[in-house]
């Protein structure tokens, strides 16, 4: 959810997020490729290897989105391109999973749909080594983010190096999204819905308020959805993305309708 908030700040778009912009899907494809290659050769994948692969995939997708953003003026077209990237990466991931050995297909399929069931304390420690410094860096950028939200011209007027700041936002958002995807697979709508729910709850859009709220709110939201996914139809376990979509998609619909009605009144 923190990655989603950073992307919403960077693109100035309320529905930007790792899943919608295709970043999570790019990370998923890279991790799936590494896992299939390693597993088919009887090798073990370390946490660092998965994080590195996910980050490379996330940055590749992000690079494509940024290239498209320079050619289009309408943000809606950029979002559609991001969604298409996600579909392409997901389709290629399915082809990759098809080449996995039979004993590994179930685990790979569950991971590719989004699941916390394969997480271990070793994974948590490895992710924490990356996520905590990234979040600390994001907190340090709170004041520049507040200025950037007022517009690039205003940010430059107060002495912010917009180009370097934008690169940091891209790097941090991709890194945070990659860490989650490396171990839990792509989890939809958390990065979009939670930042807006936090803003509504606290009645503030200040980064110093929203960022910690996203961290705590995203964790609570995912825990609740994971509990529902595991217990609602036990012993059958749903993918966590299917549950987050049930709660997150209405928030996105509300955002689109609210934004359209606001433009209509203007």
How would you describe each model-predicted region?
Residues 1-266:
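Alpha-helical transmembrane segments in inner-membrane proteins
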